[in-house]
Amino acid sequence: MEIVRLSLFGNPNIGVYVFANNSIALVPPSLSSGEKKVIAETLDVELVETKIANTILNGVLVVGNDNGIILPRIILDEELDILNNNLKKHDLNIYVSRSKNTALGNILLCNNKACIAGSELERQELNKISEALGVEALYKDIMNLTIPGSLAVVTDKGGVIHPDISDDENRELKEIFKVAFERATVNSGIPFIKSGLIANNKGIIVGEYTTGPEILRIRRGLSGGAI
């Protein structure tokens, strides 16, 4: 599995800017051609260029898997049109959440087997998200924090997570997502690993300040294999 370092907009916190599954990546329209090439080739995905809610924080505001994507209620009509037009061929469900929580990439953590949500998400939204993504969705705070999506990254091969997670919680996540999670940091010690990491089943992109030992742990976690 290929793993590369990257900064976007001069910032190693690349995970806040990009949402990716195994077929597409939603990227801000202002990326350079070189940056877009790295993302497309490393993850082996088609790029869809769009802002979300007139921001470049696609990784914070969007969540999903290979069955669907979940968008915040503050998305603009013209942005939704771009997504509808570009995602038809990928047969993705598109659901615009009505949740008061708009940072969906932080409050939700999903792969193609399960989805967990922080306890602040409304019950009716959890049910609709489960339907759109085609997986069981359940409430699960991590480390007493309601932002599981910012604490971890998970694919269908493995996961990486905040280094302070307890053994018991780590085992619970393994049971839910059917993959093992490796404790790791990114960008020279940042424990909120989503901020500096973009990954799918085919490739891994880490923030430019990620160290060699961090890369080894991230690679081990995301190459772990389904159980």
UniProtKB/Swiss-Prot annotation:
<dbReference type="InterPro" id="IPR002769">
    <property type="entry name" value="eIF6"/>
</dbReference>
<dbReference type="GO" id="GO:0003743">
    <property type="term" value="F:translation initiation factor activity"/>
</dbReference>
<keyword id="KW-0648">Protein biosynthesis</keyword>
<dbReference type="GO" id="GO:0042256">
    <property type="term" value="P:cytosolic ribosome assembly"/>
</dbReference>
<comment type="function">
    <text>Binds to the 50S ribosomal subunit and prevents its association with the 30S ribosomal subunit to form the 70S initiation complex.</text>
</comment>
<dbReference type="Pfam" id="PF01912">
    <property type="entry name" value="eIF-6"/>
</dbReference>
<dbReference type="GO" id="GO:0043022">
    <property type="term" value="F:ribosome binding"/>
</dbReference>
<keyword id="KW-0396">Initiation factor</keyword>
<protein>
    <recommendedName>
        <fullName>Translation initiation factor 6</fullName>
    </recommendedName>
</protein>
<comment type="similarity">
    <text>Belongs to the eIF-6 family.</text>
</comment>
